[in-house]
Amino acid sequence: LLDSLGGRAAVAAAIHARLLALRGALEASEFFATHEVVGSSLLFVYDEDDGGPPPSCWMIDFAKTMQVDAAAVPPPGLTHRAKWELGNHEDGYLSGLDSLIDVWGALKLQLEMESK
């Protein structure tokens, strides 16, 4: 991953910021709170040209997203972070996103340190 960034701390910083914004939006989303998201993907996009569009990340592939009946989910409801157990509809989406945020944050810091 470091090699593909070509030492560009700004790219890592932009992706990291986008992932943080995505997590914030998902945590505030009524739709996300009531849907199990299985098999979706994150599409990372950036142009190697410095004059291209800013680096970003997008959620894609929602074919297996299903609304969950609130009565079928024990309190505190669907968290997207709780461990999956048969019938709890937890998908681990936010756990995975948290891990990606940690990875991109570490990449950003490493590239910033290397550029000094």
Protein language model features and the residues they cover:
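Polybasic, positively charged surfaces/segments
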Residues: 1-116
